[in-house]
């Protein structure tokens, strides 16, 4: 899995609560980047075994740049890149590379494309229209549909973010994620 998110987050959030560590809890990777972390963890369907990360504040009170490399419990590799210091924009690209196909999506699910083995390019995948966040929440609550993102995904994301912070604070040293934290 390879994921990238970019936005002119640093300049846009200067002098706001988003760049006050005690209020925000983190910077770009914890804000817009959290959508990337959640998407990757959800697509992976399993926890991380090991993570190495580097975060850079670019002179700001919180991080605005980040690079993450990780290995899933199955051994599959993951790379993530977060750039909050770029031209006015907010976009992403997430790819899952398999031996039979490549999937492409975004961190907000704004597209789904597939390139199958033997095909020359990505093709759009038709999906049902979204119910909308609140309608979907209510349908799950009423038992009309399964939760599309159960709590375990959030727990795996929290374990990933903790490992990213720990690795970055130790100069990018790889950090092992405990199985109970990752699953």
Task: Please place each PLM-identified region on the residue numbering.
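Mobile, glycine-enriched helix-loop/loop "lid" segments at the mouths of ligand-binding/catalytic clefts
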Residues: 2-7, 102-105, 113
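Active-site loop of classical SDR/Rossmann-like NAD(P)-dependent oxidoreductases
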Residues: 123-135
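Predominantly a Rossmann-like dinucleotide-binding segment in NAD(P)-dependent oxidoreductases
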Residues: 1-54, 59-60, 171
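A short, polar/proline- and glycine-enriched secondary-structure boundary/capping micro-motif
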Residues: 88-93, 114-119, 123-125
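Contiguous beta-strand/loop segments that form the cofactor/metal-binding neighborhood of enzyme cores
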Residues: 37-111, 132-147, 163, 176-183
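Glycine- and charged-residue-rich phosphate/anionic-cofactor binding loop of Rossmann-like
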Residues: 122-125, 140-157, 172-174
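Active-site donor-binding loop signature of nucleotide-sugar glycosyltransferases
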Residues: 3-5, 82, 125, 179
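C-terminal hydrophobic helical "lid"/dimerization subdomain
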Residues: 154-168
């Amino acid at each position: 899995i390879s994921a990238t998110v970019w936005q002119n987050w640093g300049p846009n959030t200067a002098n706001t609560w988003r760049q006050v560590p005690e209020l925000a809890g983190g910077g770009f990777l914890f804000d817009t980047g959290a959508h990337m972390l959640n998407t990757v963890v959800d697509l992976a369907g399993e926890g991380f075994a090991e993570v190495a990360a580097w975060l850079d504040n670019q002179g700001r009170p919180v991080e605005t740049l980040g690079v993450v490399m990780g290995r899933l419990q199955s051994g599959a590799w993951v790379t993530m890149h977060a750039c909050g210091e770029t031209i006015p924009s907010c976009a992403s690209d997430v790819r899952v590379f398999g031996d039979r196909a490549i999937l492409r999506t975004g961190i907000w699910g704004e597209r789904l494309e597939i390139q199958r083995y033997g095909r020359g390019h990505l093709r759009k995948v038709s999906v049902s229209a979204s119910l909308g966040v609140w309608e979907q929440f209510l349908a799950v609550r009423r038992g009309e549909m399964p939760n599309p993102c159960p709590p375990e995904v959030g727990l795996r994301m929290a374990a990933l973010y903790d490992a990213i912070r720990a690795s970055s604070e130790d100069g990018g040293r790889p950090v092992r994620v405990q199985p109970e934290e990752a699953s």
